[in-house]
């Protein structure tokens, strides 16, 4: 049994997009929560190309004497997950906690995530209790969660909640993945050996409106499916095989009916044409599926994701262990 790695410093990464109204309260509550920790801390707020005064507010907070805040300013809007990855590239902590800027997930939950992560967990996920979102957002979130679980095989209760904690080696592994479209919770689970989910509170949004419109949710769904799995490509072969088998069975049925009950049961060969058409359509889908397999392999190679991830090497030779983990 391995000894849990000590957490000497905690980094908080918060993506910000047009949240100038909530920023003062967000920073106050986050600092207050981090002061309860037994470890050092830093708070990285990543401005994702905001069109309001969010960048100015963050800059002023970061320049204040004795501030624990680090402002990372992006030149334009790249999206929530890209902004978080930008924050990851600047963290210095042993444990990294991500948090949304809308205060719907209370920063007061941070000490609990750190406490759970200290029990030798690589990733600590969260499940929102008594969600305060609209009916549409709840239904959309459930559909996306179900779709992700079916297509990726990663069973988690709430993919949409960004209040999560990651060990430093998980962050380093994700930074070695250079694909442009990614979904951090699933990517982290790809490298995690030990994960857990805990329930957290969920509050109503006090400032502004949600930045996820209907079209952004639809785009997110497509990004999730296409950037994390090649299952849709393989489904072409499955559907094609089913159509071809259906057409073949239909043709056998028509031949049997014609032989035993007369030609009128086969509609003078018209139904047989449909059966043959089904077989050809199925064959086309199978061909597209095979082509998709090759495209999927090219896609996986282009992403340049590590073939494997070694969390640690236990050896009596410290030098050997160091070389293996580089």
UniProtKB/Swiss-Prot annotation:
Domain of life: Bacteria
GO CC annotation terms, alphabetical: plasma membrane
Gene Ontology MF, one: phosphotransferase activity, for other substituted phosphate groups
EC assignment: 2.4.2.53
Keyword set, alphabetical order: Antibiotic resistance, Cell inner membrane, Cell membrane, Glycosyltransferase, Lipid A biosynthesis, Lipid biosynthesis, Lipid metabolism, Lipopolysaccharide biosynthesis, Membrane, Transferase, Transmembrane, Transmembrane helix
GO biological process: 4-amino-4-deoxy-alpha-L-arabinopyranosyl undecaprenyl phosphate biosynthetic process; lipid A biosynthetic process; lipopolysaccharide biosynthetic process; response to antibiotic
Function: Catalyzes the transfer of 4-deoxy-4-formamido-L-arabinose from UDP to undecaprenyl phosphate. The modified arabinose is attached to lipid A and is required for resistance to polymyxin and cationic antimicrobial peptides.
Homology family: Belongs to the glycosyltransferase 2 family.
Name the UniProt record assigns to this protein: Undecaprenyl-phosphate 4-deoxy-4-formamido-L-arabinose transferase
Organism: Sodalis glossinidius (strain morsitans)
Gene field: arnC
